[in-house]
Amino acid sequence: MKTGLRIALVLLAIGPCSGSFCAARAQSETGCILRVHVDGLRNVKGVVGVLLFRSADGWPEDVSKSVRHDASPIAAGPRSATVVFNGIAAGDYGIVALHDENKNMKLDRNLFGIPKEGFGFANNPHVGLGPPPFRAAVVYVGCPTTDTLIHIIYK
């Protein structure tokens, strides 16, 4: 009798939902939140756009191959922005950010193909003559919330 009572009290204390089962259920019902914080902007013109990729296909500029994309205004004081993605599935995402100063929804380049606007990648990998490989900019997004910081660079 005492053992049954102890089990009942333990189950009552734990509650009806605990462990990874309920975490998985909550994730499937609401999805995860990803907050991409972007700093290092040279001015407050335009917006900061962020693209999420699940694979190297289209990486890093093909918006049509990104699984999600969004933009955010730039905060005047710190010259930073945060783009929030709600309801995304947990998993690995390659993340790229763009300081779209003229709001034309693309990375403007000069005659030599060098970007005229700022850009950056998750994990802030070294950028040489081309974009880093997809795997270098992958972040695992877990529930309930994941935050990542991207430093914008200008060439």
Residue ranges and their predicted role:
Residues 8-19:
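Bacterial N-terminal signal peptides
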Residues 32-40, 50, 150:
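A short, amphipathic beta-strand motif
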Residues 40, 85-87:
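Short, flexible loop/turn segments at beta-strand junctions in immunoglobulin-like
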Residues 49-53, 96:
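Beta-strand signatures of extracellular beta-sandwich domains
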Residues 77, 89-90:
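Surface-exposed loops/turns
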Residues 79-83, 135-137, 146-148:
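Short strand-edge motifs at loop-to-beta-strand transitions and within beta-strands
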Residues 91-97:
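A short tyrosine-centered beta-strand micro-motif
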Residues 101-109:
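Acidic, glycine-anchored loop motifs typical of Ca2+
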